[in-house]
Swiss-Prot record:
Keywords: Ribonucleoprotein, Ribosomal protein, RNA-binding, rRNA-binding. SMART domains: Ribosomal_L14. This is Large ribosomal subunit protein uL14. Belongs to the universal ribosomal protein uL14 family. GO terms for cellular component: cytosolic large ribosomal subunit. Binds to 23S rRNA. Forms part of two intersubunit bridges in the 70S ribosome.
Length: 122
């Protein structure tokens, strides 16, 4: 469960290292985001020379969550960390590489470019 003030690791090479959730998109008073949901976040730490700078406000999609998601067969998929990928307004990732595994649930939300760049889809 990602909510306001939650810090997430960035799982791409856009230049950001860590972000903090400002808002969960999808409703006027929506509180929690899970895998596949879009959030608005502030960049808290960034690598020098990256596309994204510290202090920027960006949109990101959650790709890993400690809370996890329940699948149709009754199983749960959970990760060791909360991670997100920074995206543009057209749902395409800003970076050109994705680090770490991502969940298959991103396919339902039509983030196919992220799935094709990811080294492992669970």
């Amino acid at each position: 469960m990602i909510q306001q003030q939650t810090t997430l690791k960035v799982a791409d090479n856009s230049g950001a290292r860590g972000i903090m959730c400002i808002k969960v998109l999808g409703g006027s008073n929506r509180r929690y985001a899970n895998i596949g949901d879009i959030i608005v976040a502030s960049v808290k730490s960034a690598t020098p020379g990256g596309v994204v700078k510290k202090g920027e406000v960006v949109k990101a999609v959650v790709v890993r969550s400690k809370k996890g998601v329940r699948r149709a067969d009754g199983s749960y998929i959970k990760f060791d960390e909360n991670a997100a990928v920074i995206i543009k307004d057209d749902k395409q990732p800003k970076g050109t590489r994705i680090f770490g595994p991502v969940a298959r649930e991103l396919r339902d939300k039509e983030f196919n470019k992220i799935l094709s760049l990811a080294p492992e889809v669970l």
